[in-house]
Amino acid sequence: MGDRIKILTGNAHRELASEISDDLNLALGKAHVGKFSNGETSVMISESIRDMDVYIIQPTCNPNVNDNLMELLIMADAIRRASAHRITAVIPCFGYARQDKKDKSRAPITGKLVANLIETAGIDRVITMDLHASQIQGFFNIPVDNLYAEPQIIKYIRKYIPGEKVIVSPDAGGVKRAKSISDKLDADLAIIHKERKKANEVSGMILVGDVKDKVALIVDDMADTCGTLVSACEMLISKGATKVYALVTHGVLSGDAIQKLNESSLTELVITNTIPHAEKAAKCPKIKTINIAHTLSEAIRRTHHGESISSLFSDTK
C-alpha cells in the first residue's frame, strides 16, 4: 500500500478497524481517543500524518451514537490541523440516517445536519454501507461512496441456506433491495405492507405474495428493536413458510431485541459487523455474522490508488 496512507480509529469499532488494517497489511495508526475528567472528548494523534491519505474507521451508530460522532469530528479536525493530504471517513453504519426528512411539523432533518458537521470538520470523502436512505448522499457536497452488503448476503444464502426460497421485503421501501436479491437468486418475491401507529410500533401487516412451503428470507438494511421483524416472522410462519431467516446489514439490536429474537420462530438473524455486536451475539445463538472488513478494505485500497469501486457491488459468486 505504500507509506503515504494511514488508518486511524476512534472507540466505536476498534476490532473492525484492526481487521481492515490487517487486510491492507498496514499497522493501525497511533491515536489516543478518550475523555477528559469533565466528559469532553480527548483526541491526540501520536505520529506524523503530514501529507498522508488518512482513513478514519468510525461507525456512528449505537450504543454511543453521539460520542462516536463527536470522536469522528474531533479526530478529523486534529488530522486536518496536522496537515494530512486527504481525510476519508469510513462510516460503516451512518448514524441519524433515519432522520432524513421532515415527517412531522417542526421536526429537524438531522441527517443533513450531520452531513454539514462532517464537511465542516474537514473530511474530504465518506465511505459508508447501505444507507437507510440513499438520498443522504445528496446532503453532502463531497464524494460519498455508498457500498452494499448485498454481494456478501447473496453468497451467504447460496452457501448456507438450502431449499426453495422466497425473498421477503418487510416494507414497501425495501422492495428494490429484495427484488435485486430475488433476481440474482432466481427466487420468488413477497412484500409485507405494514401500518404504523408510531415509530417502532406496527399496528397491522398484510402479505403480498406466496410463501407456503418455502424458506422465507427477510432482507432489510437494519434490525433495531426487532419488534417488526419478529411480527413479520410469525406472520410468515402462519402463512405456511417452512423456515424464516432475516438477513440484515446493520444489527442495531436495541432495547429487548435479543429477548424477542430468542423467543421468536426465527431460524437465524444474519447481520454484518458494521456495528460491534459480539456481546449480544453471545446471548443469542440465532445471530450469525457476515464479515464485511474485506469489502471496506478493498474500497479503501481502490480509493487510495484512484481506482473504480463499482465492481464491489456485483461480485456475488
Swiss-Prot record:
What cofactor does this protein call for?
Mg(2+)
In terms of superkingdom, the source organism counts as Eukaryota
Region (Binding of phosphoribosylpyrophosphate) residue spans: 212-227
- Catalysis performed (reactions): D-ribose 5-phosphate + ATP = 5-phospho-alpha-D-ribose 1-diphosphate + AMP + H(+)
Q: Quick one: which pathway? A: Metabolic intermediate biosynthesis; 5-phospho-alpha-D-ribose 1-diphosphate biosynthesis; 5-phospho-alpha-D-ribose 1-diphosphate from D-ribose 5-phosphate (route I): step 1/1
Binding positions for Mg(2+)? D130, H132, D145
Q: What is its EC number?
A: 2.7.6.1
Sorted alphabetically, the Gene Ontology cellular component annotations on this record are: cytoplasm; phagocytic vesicle; ribose phosphate diphosphokinase complex
Q: Which Pfam families does the entry mention? A: Pribosyl_synth, Pribosyltran_N
One GO term in the molecular function aspect is: ATP binding
Q: Any idea which UniProt keywords this protein has? A: ATP-binding, Kinase, Magnesium, Metal-binding, Nucleotide biosynthesis, Nucleotide-binding, Transferase
Known SUPFAM superfamilies for this protein?
Answer: PRTase-like
Q: Which GO terms describe its biological process?
A: 5-phosphoribose 1-diphosphate biosynthetic process; purine nucleotide biosynthetic process; response to bacterium; ribonucleoside monophosphate biosynthetic process
Q: Which family does it belong to?
A: Belongs to the ribose-phosphate pyrophosphokinase family.
- Identify this protein by name: Ribose-phosphate pyrophosphokinase A
Q: Name the gene behind this protein.
A: prsA
